[in-house]
Swiss-Prot record:
Residues 11-20 have a biased composition (Gly residues). Belongs to the universal ribosomal protein uS5 family. It comes from the Eukaryota. Component of the ribosome, a large ribonucleoprotein complex responsible for the synthesis of proteins in the cell. The small ribosomal subunit (SSU) binds messenger RNAs (mRNAs) and translates the encoded message by selecting cognate aminoacyl-transfer RNA (tRNA) molecules. The large subunit (LSU) contains the ribosomal catalytic site termed the peptidyl transferase center (PTC), which catalyzes the formation of peptide bonds, thereby polymerizing the amino acids delivered by tRNAs into a polypeptide chain. GO terms for molecular function: RNA binding; structural constituent of ribosome. GO terms for biological process: cytoplasmic translation; oogenesis; translation. This is Small ribosomal subunit protein uS5. The keyword Ribosomal protein applies. Keywords: Developmental protein, Differentiation, Oogenesis, Phosphoprotein, Ribonucleoprotein, Ribosomal protein.
Length: 267
């Protein structure tokens, strides 16, 4: 009995020593089969923005961000950044809720996604199964993809390599401050912000963190909030007024007014 205690205490091996390899294998197989069906399924947009993207009316993500159009379908991100997107699971942690029948355990997944070239997203999902939590977190991360503004530390020579100014993000007690750094410095930070900054395409940056940085979820969310603020500051080079044209919804109103063909489920 003493030898079996460690196997029963872990949550990754199923219930008891019998559910170790078999339970995980079945779960992984179901997830793999499900992903294959989703990948082979053709995308049928359900929003106006999705229809415009599918028909090629909108050429890039920046055009969507320019008019602050909300993205409700993760396939839009796949359409523009599918081949360059990389996702990484930051952490999977068990969370419990006390019920009448006892404790209900679920798994919480933190996933970061980016293309190493100016786009970053962060997703958090809780589910009964690890595979379902990761899959849901990836979808939420794609829906939360934001543009990253990069700048220079000194002279504007070469490509932008660091954050344009000092920015701060906060979540819970954790506060993260990003500071521009000279070219060649690298990313001076803890492992969690370093992953997010690298996936965002920032090459050089100093960081300063305060609070309970051991709480990985809040640490990642604070870093994501700081990166997202790079486009929130109105620097002098953005003072010039740029007249905006009509939104894509207005420009292609005739196309959007046409009825969409409905799908009929096969009997």
């Amino acid at each position: 009995m003493a030898d079996e205690a460690p196997a029963r205490s872990g949550f990754r091996g199923g219930f008891g020593s019998r559910g170790g390899r078999g339970g995980r294998g079945r779960g992984r197989g179901r997830w793999a089969r499900g992903r294959g069906k989703e990948d082979s399924k053709e995308w049928v947009p359900v929003t106006k923005l999705g229809r415009l993207v599918r028909e090629g009316k909108i050429k890039s993500l920046e055009e969507i961000y320019l008019y602050s159009l909300p993205i409700k379908e993760f396939e839009i991100i796949d359409f523009f950044l599918g081949s360059s997107l990389k996702d990484e699971v930051l952490k999977i942690m068990p969370v419990q809720k006390q019920t009448r029948a006892g404790q209900r355990t679920r798994f919480k997944a933190f996933v970061a996604i980016g293309d190493n070239n100016g786009h970053i997203g962060l997703g958090v999902k809780c589910s009964k199964e690890v595979a379902t939590a990761i899959r849901g977190a990836i979808i939420l991360a794609k829906l939360s993809v934001v543009p990253v503004r990069r700048g220079y530390w000194g002279n504007k020579i070469g490509k932008p390599h660091t954050v344009p100014c000092k920015v701060t993000g906060k979540c819970g007690s954790v506060s993260v401050r990003l500071i521009p750094a000279p070219r060649g410095t690298g990313i001076v930070s803890a492992p969690v912000p370093k992953k997010l900054l690298t996936m965002a395409g920032i090459e050089d940056c100093y960081t300063s963190a305060r609070g309970s940085t051991g709480t990985l979820g809040n640490f990642a969310k604070a870093t994501y909030a700081a990166i997202a603020k790079t486009y929130a500051y109105l620097t002098p080079d953005l003072w010039k007024e740029m007249p905006l044209g009509s939104t894509p919804y207005q420009a292609y109103s005739d196309f959007l007014s046409k009825p969409t063909p409905r799908l009929h489920a096969d009997a």
